[in-house]
Amino acid sequence: MTPESIARLRSSFSEVAAQPRVLAGRFYKELFEAAPHLRALFPADMTSLQGHFEAALALVIRNLEDMTVLQDSLRDLGAQHVGWGAKPGDYAIVRDAIIRALRASSANWNDDLQADWHRAITAIAIPMLQGAAVHTAVFAERMAEGE
């Protein structure tokens, strides 16, 4: 990621971070409108998840220069998401919902920012998908061994 992209992402995040609950609410609204079947994977009370959403975005923004520090945690998170019912195709739906929520929350949205967020969120999704795949493969091996 270029220094210019990082600067744009940080500026964008600081703009929307002033109202974090609004951004999280928009994200979940966008997500469930785009994929109503995903609503069943979430608790009725979304309050705690909104906090997780905000914290996760802030963590990513802090580590944009070196996303490798997050790889192990993201892989573990991907494995957890398998247990919660997430499927590989859900990741693109989530990415697009985050981008729509950010766009709706930003007064300074443009094509460069859209591309920057797309790259950043994809960089998060890839290790999560890798972790999900490993988790599934280990489960399959255990099943084959009769566990």
State where each predicted segment sits.
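Globin-like tetrapyrrole-binding proteins
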Residues: 1-147
